[in-house]
């Protein structure tokens, strides 16, 4: 038996299936070193920011910002300044129903984070956007 979710392209296949089966996905993303350079590295986050904006136009997903930053006002100010899409910060969207109202974790279809396989998540999401824009299933 093979570990399906560590096979090549499994992330994209699952993302694609969820999008076409449910017509809407939930994109969660971190702030530091994902959409905003952090102190330690001199890097750009422009490609990820642009992809999130394109996702909003093409996929119409829900967006959750999932961050360790406790200054939510500062986070909101940054998101608005950068015109980054978000529906919730560190919370599930309202359609998520918990068994016994136990909120165990934030639910998402895909997570973009510099410490959690950002390159693979970026590529899978970009591939889905390209596919949906072209109206051809890859």
Stretch-by-stretch model annotation:
Residues 1-138:
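HAD-like aspartate-dependent phosphatase fold
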């Amino acid at each position: 038996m093979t570990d399906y979710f560590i096979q090549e392209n499994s992330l994209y296949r699952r993302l694609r299936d969820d999008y076409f089966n449910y017509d809407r996905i939930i994109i969660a993303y971190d702030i530091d070193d994902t959409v905003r350079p952090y102190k330690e590295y001199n890097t750009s986050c422009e490609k990820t920011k642009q992809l999130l904006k394109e996702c909003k136009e093409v996929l119409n997903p829900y967006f959750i910002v999932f961050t360790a930053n406790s200054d939510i006002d500062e986070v909101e100010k940054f998101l608005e300044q950068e015109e980054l899409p978000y529906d919730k910060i560190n919370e599930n969207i309202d359609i998520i129903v918990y068994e016994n109202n136990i909120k165990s974790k934030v639910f998402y279809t895909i997570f973009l984070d510099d410490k959690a396989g950002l390159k693979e998540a970026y590529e899978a999401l970009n591939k889905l956007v390209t596919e949906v824009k072209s109206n051809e299933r890859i």
